[in-house]
Amino acid sequence: MPSAIKGVMVQCDPSIKALILKIDSERHDIVIEELDETHLVIDSNKVQAVKNELNRLLSKNIYNPFDEQ
């Protein structure tokens, strides 16, 4: 019997897609399908977790000159 997974299509640039794929490589339960270089279908129940993890990863890569003072 076929089963279906409710998904959300995400459009992003290739660098963000790479981060989402990195997050998925640790859990293997987020990405349902890679459509092309800028589109993914992800599990609709994991959208908020992906947003939180992306924000965490991106905040580590932001340069703030005031942090050095």
Curated annotation (Swiss-Prot):
This is General transcription and DNA repair factor IIH subunit TFB5. SUPFAM superfamilies: TFB5-like. Keywords: DNA damage, DNA repair, Nucleus, Transcription, Transcription regulation. InterPro entries: TFB5-like_sf (IPR035935), TFIIH_TTDA/Tfb5 (IPR009400). Pfam families: Tfb5 (PF06331). Component of the general transcription and DNA repair factor IIH (TFIIH) core complex, which is involved in general and transcription-coupled nucleotide excision repair (NER) of damaged DNA and, when complexed to TFIIK, in RNA transcription by RNA polymerase II. In NER, TFIIH acts by opening DNA around the lesion to allow the excision of the damaged oligonucleotide and its replacement by a new DNA fragment. In transcription, TFIIH has an essential role in transcription initiation. It is found in: Nucleus. The gene is TFB5.
